[in-house]
Regions:
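CBM-like carbohydrate-recognition segments
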Residues: 1, 154, 158, 163, ...
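Single conserved hydrophobic/aromatic residue that forms the stacking wall/gate
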Residues: 2-9, 13
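Catalytic cores of carbohydrate-active enzymes
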Residues: 56-68, 120, 131-145, 191-202
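A beta-strand-loop signature enriched in Asp, Gly, Thr, and Trp
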Residues: 119-187
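Well-ordered alpha-helical scaffold segments within catalytic/enzyme domains
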Residues: 28-40, 96-114, 160-175, 231, ...
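Extended, well-ordered alpha-helical scaffold segments
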Residues: 1, 40-57, 111-129, 175-193
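Solvent-exposed loop and edge beta-strand segments that line ligand/cofactor-binding
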Residues: 11-24, 79-99, 110, 114, ...
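Loop-centered beta-sheet repeat module
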Residues: 44-105
Length: 255
């Protein structure tokens, strides 16, 4: 509640006047659980508003996706001069946002006004994720609005995040059961394409984008070439954690 706010937006993630998709995971699930465990029902409206506001400012009606961030001041070079949106949908940003939704929904009561808006956003994400799933690997691309384009690649961290989100959303009844097939295809593809086990049994998870952002001292333009040329590395915590979470959801299915 005391987190600094951007004018016309929600919590400040990194900079004033901006809202980033990935920023929702860093605060909203904790906020929702804290409100639930401490009997603070008035906070639910604020939590819901965080998600809805971010979705509204980052939504791209041309493809149904959500772009990485929005700058309502329109002063950043990466921001569209009309919408304030960044140029692309970064897979991991949308993955963080999807995970934030399914985790926060656990603690927001079914009768809460606005909860249906979160379910609608989550269902739209499920539709787009199904549509953009790579048929060969079962994963998702680093730059989702340029899936399959030259230089783009199927990236492991966003893939793990979408798999987890779909598994959990199906289990909790947030989305239709038909999306289980998408999650299962993604999980099998993840094992086949991103998991390497050496002769000593050491597991490596490959092809994770190390980091991506916007602006900063070494300016990050947010254009297509920027995203596809960021460092790729193995065993990044941002893929290890979501893959473990996805695996726990998968194992629930086997019981």
């Amino acid at each position: 509640r005391d987190q600094p706010r951007s004018r016309g937006l929600g919590d400040v993630y990194k900079r004033q006047h901006q809202m980033w998709l990935d920023g929702l995971y860093m605060g909203a699930p904790f906020y929702a659980e804290y409100a639930f465990r401490n009997n603070l029902p008035k906070d639910y409206a604020d939590i819901i508003n965080q998600f809805v506001t971010c979705a509204r400012h980052t939504y791209d009606p041309k493809n149904g996706l959500y772009r990485h961030a929005c700058d309502v001041s329109r002063t950043e070079r990466w921001a569209d001069p009309v919408t304030g949106q960044s140029k692309h949908c970064w897979g991991r940003a949308m993955g963080w946002y999807a995970m934030a939704l399914v985790d926060a929904l656990d603690f927001i009561p079914k009768h809460e006004t606005g909860r249906d808006s979160l379910l609608a956003i989550l269902n739209n994400i499920a539709v787009q994720v199904k549509k953009l799933q790579d048929p060969k690997t079962g994963g998702w691309y680093q730059v989702m609005d340029r899936s399959g384009d030259q230089g783009n690649y199927v990236e492991s961290s966003c893939s793990a995040m979408f798999i987890y989100s779909l598994f959990k959303a199906v289990r909790k009844g947030y989305i239709d059961k038909s999306y289980l097939d998408v999650a299962l295809k993604g999980y099998k593809g993840f094992l086949d394409n991103f998991i390497k086990v050496d002769r000593n049994g050491l597991v490596t998870i490959t092809k994770a984008c190390a980091v991506a952002g916007l602006g900063g001292k070494v300016y990050r333009s947010g254009d297509y070439d920027y995203y596809i040329n960021e460092t790729i590395r193995n065993n990044d915590p941002k893929v290890v954690g979501p893959f473990i979470m996805a695996s726990l959801e998968y194992e629930r299915l086997q019981k």
